[in-house]
Design a protein with these regions (language model features):
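Basic, helix-initiating cap at the start of DNA-binding domains
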Residues: 1-23, 27, 31-32, 36, ...
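Short hydrophobic clusters on alpha-helical segments that form packing/core surfaces
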Residues: 12-20, 62, 66, 88, ...
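Alpha-helical DNA-contacting segments of helix-turn-helix folds
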Residues: 20, 53-62, 69, 102, ...
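Short hydrophobic/aromatic patch on the recognition helix
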Residues: 37-48
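Hydrophobic alpha-helical connector segments
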Residues: 57, 71-98, 139, 146-149
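Amphipathic alpha-helical packing segments from all-alpha helical-bundle domains
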Residues: 67-70, 109-136, 143-148, 174-188
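Short secondary-structure transition hinges
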Residues: 90, 94-135, 158, 165, ...
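Hydrophobic alpha-helical segments that form the core
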Residues: 140-162, 173-182, 197-205, 209-210
Length: 210
């Protein structure tokens, strides 16, 4: 047995990620990954110790891929939070198999870099505090808002990835934005504050006024 595999671990994970993206989670196995790489199963088994090990390491690898491709930071915490929601919609539209791998079915897991509420994480708690200060509400209200939007966005994403809902990206973005703005208004956030923080996007008003 060689002391180290000739094929890099990252290449194996990339091949597994592409396999899931193309054919779905059910197609993921060591033989299929080996076929993608044009090698035997030995180096993959050596690297991960079997399918359980491969799956365990593919999850954070896939999360980082989603973070890099679909999420980006914006000028304030609220805009960054909304971008994560838009990124989740993009993922469901563009890569439904990967969405299902991360969010639904046997391999169900919330993205740790996305909407998951990590209340024991000081960095995340600081984000909620900053959002509360921006919006003029309490951190508890921000957490309730975040959880509501997480459930709403996950629901939209699941319907998209399942092929049940077929609509344009722009309409999905508008639905997400309008729902968030309506919820925040219900918490007493001033219209002027929402206007400033959303960059002047009043799509909710224009759509409701016909």
């Amino acid at each position: 047995m060689p002391s180290s595999p000739k094929i890099k671990k990252e290449d194996m994970l990339q091949a597994a990620l592409e396999l899931v993206s193309k054919n779905g989670y059910a197609a993921l196995n060591i033989k299929a990954v080996a076929r993608e790489l044009g090698c035997s199963t030995a180096p993959i088994s050596w690297q991960f110790g079997g399918m359980d090990g491969l799956r365990a390491e593919l999850i954070p690898f896939a999360e980082q891929y989603v973070e890099d491709k679909y999420y980006s930071r914006n000028e304030n915490e609220l805009a960054t939070f909304e971008q994560k929601g838009k990124g989740t919609i993009d993922l469901a539209l563009e890569n439904p198999n990967l969405f299902r791998f991360l969010y639904t079915g046997e391999r169900s897991q919330l993205l740790s870099t996305g909407f998951e509420l990590q209340t024991n994480n000081p960095d995340v708690a600081n984000v909620y505090q900053k959002m509360a200060e921006l919006l003029g509400i309490t951190p508890k209200q921000v957490m309730d808002f975040a959880m509501t939007m997480m459930v709403y966005t996950q629901g939209i994403g699941t319907l998209i990835a399942s092929g049940i809902v077929k609509d344009t990206k722009e309409n999905m973005y508008r639905m997400l934005h309008n729902t968030g703005m309506t919820y925040l208004k219900g918490l007493g956030v001033k219209d002027s504050t929402l206007w400033d923080l959303s960059g002047g996007d009043r799509s909710d008003e224009s759509s409701s006024n016909g």
